[in-house]
């Protein structure tokens, strides 16, 4: 089923956020700034709603100056392309930005925090279906920006609607 109206995109972004919040490894990487985030307890659903939703996994595209103490994931709808005269979107592009303070890159693991976060997002979304749309494809990423305090990687996914 295709996106017939832009109003449906917000609902589907909420479904993507719900899928990301269900990934306990991702939540631990974002919530605990210690070098051992996987040794920490998983948050309950209530704690996730209070501490993670719209704080560390966001739909809103703006990150405030006071939000740089932890890693943050922001999800945005980038575009929706129509197919000629077809009023339905054929392709919806979703961007996932991962903001990670440089002081939190190194953790007690064989990997680095921003790449673990990117990997968990990819595992949560790649080849999964979102109701009302199609299968999520992609996971390509690039460095969006780097400052003296924080890095931002952008990962893109495409949701292809089938007739």
Regions found by a protein language model. Name each.
Residues 1-5, 105-106, 142:
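Residue-level detector of alpha-helix boundaries and kinks
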């Amino acid at each position: 089923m295709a996106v017939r109206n832009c109003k449906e995109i917000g609902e589907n972004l909420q479904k993507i956020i719900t899928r990301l919040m269900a990934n306990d490894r991702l939540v631990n990487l974002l919530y605990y700034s210690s070098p051992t985030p996987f040794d920490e307890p998983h948050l309950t659903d209530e704690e996730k709603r209070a501490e993670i939703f719209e704080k560390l996994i966001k739909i809103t595209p703006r990150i405030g100056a006071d939000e740089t103490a932890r890693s943050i994931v922001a999800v945005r709808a980038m575009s929706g392309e129509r197919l000629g005269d077809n009023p339905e979107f054929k392709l919806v592009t979703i961007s996932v930005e991962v903001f990670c303070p440089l002081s939190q890159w190194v953790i007690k693991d064989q990997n680095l925090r921003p790449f673990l976060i990117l990997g968990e997002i990819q595992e949560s979304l790649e080849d999964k279906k979102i109701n009302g749309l199609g299968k999520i494809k992609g996971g390509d990423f690039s460095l969006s920006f780097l400052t003296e305090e924080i890095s931002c990687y952008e990962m893109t996914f495409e949701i292809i609607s089938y007739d």
